[in-house]
């Protein structure tokens, strides 16, 4: 009925759900078959955009292996009208870049910083699919990445690898996070330096 009415529910008058974010925990700990089932169910329900929020590439980049990428390709072949967006969570360039014994980022002959091999391979696997977007979103955390240089390197290297920088945000103002939060004014300053 919703489809027959141009995306408007005939009784409630509301638009259909167009975008879904899979998050809350980490959906990338699910098996490929479970992810495929979720993706297909959402596509069949008429969802136009699926975002997958994950920190898994920082912890276990091998999860983004050939079989996972093949599952994504099959999904896209079946539902090409559905946008798929991988929303990665990297907070600091140390999570993606190699360092030498002195703690400096490793550069190649052209001066480009080198990714940690497994993470770089996973990123290339995702970013190499022109139909899928890869974005980074991260909190600004006191004592971790509240540094303009670190965020600049993170953004530059992520973009150079084929990703986009979605956004940075401040933590929620609750007791458990207070030690890690920075004032929004300071976040604004950092992002504009």
Predicted feature descriptions by range:
Residues 186-193:
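C-terminal accessory extensions appended to soluble enzyme cores
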Residues 3-19, 25-186:
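Conserved AdoMet/S-adenosylmethionine-binding subsite of the radical SAM
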């Amino acid at each position: 009925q919703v489809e027959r009415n141009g995306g408007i529910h005939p009784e409630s008058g509301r638009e259909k759900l167009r975008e879904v974010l899979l998050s809350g925990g980490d959906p990338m700990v699910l098996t490929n078959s479970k992810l495929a089932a979720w993706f297909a169910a959402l596509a069949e329900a008429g969802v136009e955009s699926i975002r997958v929020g994950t920190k898994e590439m920082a912890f276990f980049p091998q999860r983004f292996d050939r079989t996972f990428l093949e599952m994504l390709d099959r999904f896209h072949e079946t539902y090409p009208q559905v946008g798929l967006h991988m929303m990665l969570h990297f907070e600091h360039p140390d999570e993606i870049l190699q360092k030498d014994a002195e703690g400096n980022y490793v550069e190649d002959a052209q001066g480009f910083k080198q990714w940690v091999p497994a993470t770089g391979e996973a990123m290339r696997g995702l970013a190499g699919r022109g139909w899928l977007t890869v974005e980074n979103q991260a909190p600004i955390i006191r004592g971790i990445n509240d540094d303009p240089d670190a965020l600049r390197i993170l953004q530059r290297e992520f973009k150079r690898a084929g990703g986009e920088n979605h956004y940075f945000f401040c933590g929620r103002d609750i007791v458990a996070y207070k030690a890690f939060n920075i004032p929004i004014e300071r976040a604004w300053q950092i992002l504009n330096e």
